Amino acid sequence: MNKPNPNKQTVELNRTSLYWGLLLIFVLAVLFSSYIFN
């Protein structure tokens, strides 16, 4: 029986949450800059 590696799963989960965090920061930065410059 070949079980998936839980460590690999954790790394993928961390990478996904990291990408979501970067996307959230990027969106907030765009909204903040448009709020400042208008």
From Swiss-Prot:
Q: Which of UniProt's keywords are assigned here?
A: Chloroplast, Membrane, Photosynthesis, Photosystem II, Plastid, Reaction center, Thylakoid, Transmembrane, Transmembrane helix
Q: Which HAMAP family match?
A: PSII_PsbL
Q: Give membrane topology per the record.
A: Single-pass membrane protein
- Per the UniProt record, the source organism is Tupiella akineta (Green alga)
Could you say which protein family the record assigns here?
Answer: Belongs to the PsbL family.
- Its name, as the record gives it, is Photosystem II reaction center protein L
Q: Which residues cross the membrane?
A: 17-37
Please provide the Gene Ontology terms (biological process) for this protein. photosynthesis
Principal place where this protein is found? plastid
Q: Which InterPro entries does this UniProt record tie to the protein?
A: PSII_PsbL, PSII_PsbL_sf
Q: Where in the cell is it found?
A: Plastid, Chloroplast thylakoid membrane
Which function does this protein serve? One of the components of the core complex of photosystem II (PSII). PSII is a light-driven water:plastoquinone oxidoreductase that uses light energy to abstract electrons from H(2)O, generating O(2) and a proton gradient subsequently used for ATP formation. It consists of a core antenna complex that captures photons, and an electron transfer chain that converts photonic excitation into a charge separation. This subunit is found at the monomer-monomer interface and is required for correct PSII assembly and/or dimerization.
Assembly notes: PSII is composed of 1 copy each of membrane proteins PsbA, PsbB, PsbC, PsbD, PsbE, PsbF, PsbH, PsbI, PsbJ, PsbK, PsbL, PsbM, PsbT, PsbX, PsbY, PsbZ, Psb30/Ycf12, at least 3 peripheral proteins of the oxygen-evolving complex and a large number of cofactors. It forms dimeric complexes.
Q: Which GO terms describe its cellular component?
A: chloroplast thylakoid membrane; photosystem II reaction center
**Pfam families reported for this sequence:** PsbL
